[in-house]
Amino acid sequence: MGRARPGQRGPPSPGPAAQPPAPPRRRARSLALLGALLAAAAAAAVRVCARHAEAQAAARQELALKTLGTDGLFLFSSLDTDGDMYISPEEFKPIAEKLTGSCSVTQTGVQWCSHSSLQPQLPWLNUSSCLSLLRSTPAASCEEEELPPDPSEETLTIEARFQPLLPETMTKSKDGFLGVSRLALSGLRNWTAAASPSAVFATRHFQPFLPPPGQELGEPWWIIPSELSMFTGYLSNNRFYPPPPKGKEVIIHRLLSMFHPRPFVKTRFAPQGAVACLTAISDFYYTVMFRIHAEFQLSEPPDFPFWFSPAQFTGHIILSKDATHVRDFRLFVPNHRSLNVDMEWLYGASESSNMEVDIGYIPQMELEATGPSVPSVILDEDGSMIDSHLPSGEPLQFVFEEIKWQQELSWEEAARRLEVAMYPFKKVSYLPFTEAFDRAKAENKLVHSILLWGALDDQSCUGSGRTLRETVLESSPILTLLNESFISTWSLVKELEELQNNQENSSHQKLAGLHLEKYSFPVEMMICLPNGTVVHHINANYFLDITSVKPEEIESNLFSFSSTFEDPSTATYMQFLKEGLRRGLPLLQP
């Protein structure tokens, strides 16, 4: 077998084969590494773009501030709903609609004309404000267009009586309003007289006060229903101008506008609206008693909103069953308590801005008819117009028939029913402070007492008091136990301080002093013996804190939750009341 010559190829030898492809796992790692590198590069690019966009936005913001000033930027930002520092046609549409006379809600979700929106997107701007900011005279709402006057209808003249709030009754007056700027209170200080001392209304405007068909004497109905509750939240504080009134809201808005040009018929906090009941019925007439919760916003840009919330507006109207004649009308803020107005004002242009709160007293805020409604045009038997004045210049005097009432209800009972309609917790009778302890002695019961800064049963109440009355105090188990085992009362701190300083009655002094010793801001709930000794008490803020956590997180056995009730607040308040009974009942005189 010979050898091959040099350079001559032989058959292929079985030497090493060609390199095989890389294993799949190694390839996956390579791809993952490549993907990570690309992702990192993309993220870096995004960050660079974001920083660039932020820098551009900051530059635009700075330029806008320099060009428009603080107040102008505030207005611009409120319209710029997407925050891109440009006003698009859709964003400008509300202003355009107002300028062209349209009040329709836009299709972009801007709902500041809608009463169904509880959190408006533009919280301080609405249909009735856009043109007011651009012109010196506010535009009338499209909901308030007058019907053509009917010469045959009667008119009612109403006068406004107004005495401004007494600054010395405000809590912050005690330290000379230290830390409160004059600008913040300028709207309040400048409100010294009614906006319209007198106004004339057609009787048909009062049709919303007529009861629904078949309404019984003393049975409440809602003229304007409340749309808020603890579950819906509250309306924005950061608004200047009220939304256009609708339907039955219009007459309430017009009446309240006699006091101030910016009444809000729907309050920010529950209960809202207006409730009424019949207190007298005759063949041709009704007497209707009503209670209205409304408030006013006193500031205009560039100042921040200042809210003025009277305790309530109450009153009555006597009108014919077809609303063609009004015999009498009166509306007023009750002034029998030492404090009757809640005030809240913002220190910034956003919903999260700091807010100051105070309470005070307004001596008079009242509307009253000067007399019964009279015909707009007086005709004789032949249909000819008669001069409404005698030759001497004196106006003609009308003689009105006496109304014979067939059913009547007392003012006190009607007021109680309206109060319960607004505040279900008033299904328990809350007696005046000293009267409650007299009753407790007579019935040998403990006193359930609530001491607070603002009134528990009207709109001057403070935040934690509102929470209590809308949750635990109106719950069925609490109502039952309070009615069965306690005499209940609530009091203003200011009134007990006055009682404590009154030298004429030492027993009342002692009662007030025992309460004030246990009081902590803002609300204190107490269980007392008939002699005023406090056997148990809890602060509202602490109560709300412990009911906002899980039961197992509460260390105190005294305020532990019961498995009987699903609601932690109700369960805890029930434990508070029962502990008061456990401590107090053995100490009652047999």
From Swiss-Prot:
Organism: Homo sapiens
Record's keyword annotation contains Membrane: yes
Name the UniProt record assigns to this protein: Selenoprotein N
GO terms under biological process: ATP metabolic process; calcium ion homeostasis; calcium ion import; cell redox homeostasis; cellular response to caffeine; cellular response to oxidative stress; collagen fibril organization; diaphragm contraction
Superkingdom as given in the UniProt entry: Eukaryota
UniProt feature coiled coil, ranges: none
Alphabetic keyword roster: Desmin-related myopathy, Disease variant, Endoplasmic reticulum, Glycoprotein, Membrane, Myofibrillar myopathy, Oxidoreductase, Selenocysteine, Signal
Chain ranges of the EF-hand domain: 67-102
Function summary: Essential for muscle regeneration and satellite cell maintenance in skeletal muscle.
Region (Disordered), start-end ranges: 1-26
GO cellular component, one term: mitochondria-associated endoplasmic reticulum membrane contact site
Disease: Congenital myopathy 3 with rigid spine: An autosomal recessive, slowly progressive muscular disorder apparent from birth or early childhood and characterized by hypotonia, proximal muscle weakness, poor axial muscle strength, scoliosis and neck weakness, and a variable degree of spinal rigidity. Most patients remain ambulatory. Early ventilatory insufficiency may lead to death by respiratory failure.
Glycosylation sites per record: 126, 190, 483, 505, 531
Entry keyword Oxidoreductase: yes
Free-text tissue specificity from the UniProt record: Isoform 1 and isoform 2 are expressed in skeletal muscle, brain, lung and placenta. Isoform 2 is also expressed in heart, diaphragm and stomach.
A GO MF term: calcium ion binding
Biased composition (Pro residues): 9-23
Signal peptide limits: 1-43
InterPro entries per record: EF_hand_dom (IPR002048)
